[in-house]
Amino acid sequence: TYYAEDHPRKSELLDFYVANTVKILSDFGYEQAIALNHAENIVKFDAILAQYANTSEEWAKYAELYNPVPIKAFIEALTTVPFADVIEGILGKLPDKVIVYEKRVYANFDAIMNEANFELIKSWMLVKLIRSSTHYLSDDLRILGSEFSRKLSGTSEARSQEKHAFDLATDQYSQAVGLYYGHTYFGESAKADVKRMTTEMIKVYQERLDKNTWLSRPTIDKAIKKLDAMTVFIGFPDKLPDIYKQFTVTHESIYSLVARFNVVRSHRHYAKFNEPVDKTEWHMPAHMVNAYFSPDSNTIVFPAAILQKPFYSETEQTKSQNYGGIGAVIAHEISHAFDNNGALFDEFGNMNNWWTDEDFKAFEAKQELMIAEFDGLDIAGAKVNGKLVVSENIADAGGLTAAMTAALRETDVDLKAFFTQWGEIWRIKASQEYQQMLLSMDVHAPGKLRANIQVSNLDEFFDTFDVKEGDGMWRSETDRVKIW
């Protein structure tokens, strides 16, 4: 966090934030002195929150954040806010338990939310509301409201009005835009081909698990059982969310429409309390170039937009290239079922430790090897936090290995094309500031390191490119990290 005393850009960023906030508040009609007071107050209150908030590293280990607290204990622990009334007013009843993700905030809540801090809290709420509203007002305010994020990421100019209009539409109707994209640009033939690759990748994983040498048989059998139960979604969902039926577009201002839509979303969110979970619901629109594994449903999802070059092409890329692209991504998402977080969920998506103690200790030892391999690597004028990126690195390692195994089964395999495609999908164009920001918060390693470090764990890479000891990408056999 840039509130930390040792953050190299602390003064630069916070001073800029205050000045930018004063400009925004002034445009809303606040006098300079009052605007400055509010801006300084929000920084003071943010600094208080930063002392207790989870770190990026803690958020990365999300399975460890599950901390259920009985409702009686929860209410008694937080005395400065009448949470019994608040929760009952929202849900209509009190739940049995509350899941506390931020233990330090919970333990220090009364020291944060109290009468002494009330003026800071009021400024914090006011400024947050005003800054968030700038996206929906004049174009000058939109540009002014995004100045701080551009400063943080090193972006030279605001998004164009055209792109902003697209952002507004997709923010409110993401699944509708995704469904249009899927129907327009994604074909059944490509879907069938990717489904075939996914089936092959799961089969490879099952075989590799069956031959695993560091797990006991009971754990191997349960891991294979989890693979057998995995659900795969490809392309786009079959239906739109029902909530869209409650969205009515009128000639109100954009701000009023968004505010009304947010109320609808909030009501729908809390109405889901104690309802059965819809495991067919997509949490990512089809036009997004991404993919994900959902641990609480044991589901992997590949939106239509990622099923294009350089990840995949049915007609313009070879099978080896496709395995190095989308194949590795598919296997990466499968691997998340067995990373340091996903491994704590069973085949039904329930948090349930299905490992023997001895097996999990062996797994943790392998995690430490992956942490050490990346920790402290220099890039973009900063260093990698190995603990922050370990889950994604485990998935990358397992995914690349499984995809290569599948590619080798093809009669026309070309490992040079396979590895080259893997490198191509991680190309990135970004400012140094943006890369440094990601290093502090993103659970993924930088693209260049994802491309180059992971391949150096595979013996086949050295054979394919004739890499010898003394070459830049050489890694001795004893230092090559292999997990799945």
Residue ranges and their predicted role:
Residues 42, 48, 77-81, 92, ...:
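Intrinsically disordered, low-complexity linker/terminal regions across diverse proteins
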Residues 1-200, 237:
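Noncatalytic, helix-rich "gating/capping" subdomain that lines the substrate-entry/channel surface
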